[in-house]
Amino acid sequence: METTLILGSNSFSGATFADFVLALGGHVVGTSRSAEPNNAFLPYKWHDNKNFTFHELDLNKHLKELMELIQDIKPAYVVNFAAQSMVGESWQNPSDWFMTNAVSTIKFHDELRKYDSLKRYVHVSTPEVYGSCSGFVGENFAFNPSTPYAVSRATADMSLRTFYTAYNFPVVTTRAANVYGPGQQLYRIIPRTILFILLGRKLQLHGGGVSTRSFIHMKDVCDATWKVMTDGNNGETYHISTDEVISIRSLVERICLKLNVAFDDHVEFVGDRIGKDSAYHLDSKKIRAKLGWEDKTSLEQGLDECISWVKSNFEILKQQPFDYQHKP
């Protein structure tokens, strides 16, 4: 099978997609700006995968080395999960978010477009570019970003539109909301809630937890990403989401119920974060109709898997940072 290059392979999404491709018999090369983290956060390390190699490369500092790697391994597919994430924190050092998500990413695109052997470039974007919305949002919905993070991501997205038009660059874009699953970073709501309950710590619930989201298991996102990568149409965007909508409070209540604890004993309410979108729900009819994709993992099943993962790795996880660690 052809080689797939995954940028941001240390990320939850990137590591899980690497594991997905390897399970299909593919060859995967991963890059991230930091050394590989603990194996508990790397699903591709949970199986005997021999077709994965890792290179520590920073998109902001090692563009030349990254392009040399591409020329050496000649991947048919490049999937980019690499980005400065964390919406709230982007207000504190916005230039860092713009450097990674806009400037360095666009520089990479400008080099990658000159690579002749590329079959498909998958740009993993975010629904944050739409801002707060009512109802279900389709792929052609206008951008209305409300945070530095969202603006930085929208910048690269719009740049890619011009690259497709001007150069026929073989790009497809995905937006998924909201991903979760075993191996996710501990500052995300689901693993954080589970871990804090098991540790007897109080979870801070911003804005009372009234904001609503859809949660989709990363296994389903991997399946969708694979279909987009292999069968999608260049220049198009595909939304990956479920139709189930739940408030953050209800999500935490559901986890408390599964762990047999009282919600009020483990939660404290704090003010909302600046620029936080109250809701964005993605319409995924397109990928279902055009590529035959469907989500298969219910939230109930997915939460059980996450609880099992936290319990199985509890001694390791309780020693890890619980909060996002910013790195310029």
Regions found by a protein language model. Name each.
Residues 1-179, 305, 313, 322, ...:
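N-terminal Rossmann-like NAD(P)+-binding domain of SDR-like oxidoreductases, especially those catalyzing
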Residues 18, 23, 30-31, 197-328:
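C-terminal substrate-binding subdomain of Rossmann-fold SDR/epimerase-dehydratase oxidoreductases
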Residues 65-73, 111, 196, 224, ...:
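CheY-like receiver
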Residues 94, 174, 186-187, 232:
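Active-site loop immediately N-terminal to the catalytic Tyr-X3-Lys motif
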Residues 122, 132-134, 168, 184, ...:
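Proline-centered turn/helix-capping motifs that create local helix->coil transitions or kinks
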Residues 155, 159-163, 193, 251, ...:
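Hydrophobic alpha-helix immediately C-terminal to the catalytic Tyr-X-X-X-Lys motif of short-chain
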Residues 186-194:
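A glycine/serine/threonine-rich, flexible loop-to-helix segment
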